[in-house]
Amino acid sequence: IIVILVIIGIIFGINQIIKSKNDNVQKLAKVYEDLKSSQSYCFQMERNNNNKIIMAQKGDKTIIDQYTKEEEANTQNHTTTLIKDNNTYLILHDRKEYYVYEENNVDQTILINGIKDIINKEFTRGNEKVRGKRYDYEEYSGSSMFMISNTLNIDENEVKTRFYFDKNDNLAYIKTIYGDDNELLKISLTKDVDDAMFEIPSDYAEN
């Protein structure tokens, strides 16, 4: 019986050490390392059905897809910045037209480098209920990168960003907090990227 109790005690102690080690892991840093080592990813930030941003990369091709609609507006705006073949394309979907900027590459590492800058800042940990479920979060100060709303008049030093993770450490939500206001984005991150995302529709005209 004593031997069994000792074994149980050892197992419990090992589990506590592992749990403590996992609790101290910087989860956003793991997201960064995963993105940096991947050849493709699709990162979607959604405030609601009418306002979202999709950033995708596959090899040397990148898109930034933006959907916006103001509350008083009747239509949704959809624009895409596409970088491929050493050119940048600005696609205006409502007009079915696009502009070509030859040999003018937009920074294709904006997402990865943005997260890299954030993980080097001080952060705190917590747990909070979001839309009915509880999530662990890491809160960082000094970045408005993940705000879809207008950020022109915002003092970044006053901004806090919470990254919420599910039980499998997948990024689930991002909340940007500024004073009494906040913006919550639902996050989807996958490595499955369809090549069709990087194609301009055949019925669009070059301007």
Language-model regions, residue ranges each:
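Flexible, processing/modification-adjacent segments and terminal tails
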Residues: K19-K27, D34, I83-D155, A196-I200
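Compositionally biased amphipathic helical and low-complexity segments enriched in hydrophobic
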Residues: V6, K36, I83, I91-H93, ...
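N-terminal leader/targeting segments and the immediate start of mature chains
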Residues: I1-K61, K191-N207
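Glycine-rich loops and low-complexity Gly/Arg-rich segments
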Residues: I10, I14, Q66-T68, G114-D117, ...
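An acidic-aromatic
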Residues: N51-G114, N170-L184
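Gly/Pro-enriched, hydrophobic low-complexity segments
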Residues: Y67-T79, R131-A205
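Residues that act as N-cap/strand-start positions at coil-to-secondary-structure junctions
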Residues: S37, N48-N49, N74-T75, E122, ...
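Short, exposed beta-strand/loop patches in secreted or surface proteins that constitute
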Residues: Y32-K36, K52-K58, T80-L82, K121-K129, ...
